[in-house]
């Protein structure tokens, strides 16, 4: 396994997923679901999923995800965009599932919270490029640890209300 390739593949989804939290600092936020409920009477995604967060996640994931490739030439801008946009999509899918399970915003849901963004990114990206199975397995193993650590740092920085 080429560790450089591995880390450059997981970098855009990690950045996209982690940077969306900065939208919570904005004064005005617009929920992706427009405050509407699903057929079960519960919110589709909830107030935590906003257009601003989606835009910040995709933009930062694409730009910062591509940046190291100016040196290493592993993935292109399109790749960084697909990985970032699909990571944000995965996070929305995770929020949708949590709302269906009656979990409130911010409630921990292992392993859904830790892997929804990454597995969706890999699934969508695999429609365009081959991803070695060993990379997916390695990412599934290390991502919960990295996710927990970065969320705790975001909590300490008061970017998140919960440390998970």
Curated annotation (Swiss-Prot):
Metabolic or biological pathway, per its Swiss-Prot or TrEMBL entry: Membrane lipid metabolism; glycerophospholipid metabolism
Protein's UniProt name: CDP-archaeol synthase
Cofactor(s) required, per the database record: Mg(2+)
Keywords assigned: Cell membrane, Lipid biosynthesis, Lipid metabolism, Magnesium, Membrane, Phospholipid biosynthesis, Phospholipid metabolism, Transferase, Transmembrane, Transmembrane helix
Purpose of the protein: Catalyzes the formation of CDP-2,3-bis-(O-geranylgeranyl)-sn-glycerol (CDP-archaeol) from 2,3-bis-(O-geranylgeranyl)-sn-glycerol 1-phosphate (DGGGP) and CTP. This reaction is the third ether-bond-formation step in the biosynthesis of archaeal membrane lipids.
Any GO molecular function: CDP-2,3-bis-(O-geranylgeranyl)-sn-glycerol synthase activity
Subcellular location: Cell membrane
Family to which this protein belongs: Belongs to the CDP-archaeol synthase family.
Source organism per UniProt: Pyrobaculum aerophilum (strain ATCC 51768 / DSM 7523 / JCM 9630 / CIP 104966 / NBRC 100827 / IM2)
GO cellular component: plasma membrane
């Amino acid at each position: 396994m080429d560790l450089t390739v591995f880390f450059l593949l997981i970098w855009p989804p990690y950045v996209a997923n982690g940077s969306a939290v900065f939208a919570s600092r904005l004064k005005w936020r617009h929920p992706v679901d427009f405050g509407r409920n699903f057929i079960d009477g519960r919110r589709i995604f909830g107030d935590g999923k906003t257009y601003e967060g989606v835009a910040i996640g995709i933009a930062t994931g694409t730009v910062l995800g591509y940046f190291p490739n100016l040196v290493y030439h592993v993935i292109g801008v399109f790749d960084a965009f697909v990985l970032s946009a699909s990571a944000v999509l995965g996070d929305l899918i995770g929020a949708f599932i949590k709302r269906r399970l009656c979990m409130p915003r911010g409630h921990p849901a292992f392993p859904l919270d830790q892997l929804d963004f990454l597995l969706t990114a890999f699934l969508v990206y695999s429609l365009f490029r081959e991803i070695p199975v060993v990379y997916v397995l390695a990412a599934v193993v290390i991502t919960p640890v990295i996710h927990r650590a970065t969320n705790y740092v975001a909590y300490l920085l008061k970017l998140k209300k919960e440390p998970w």
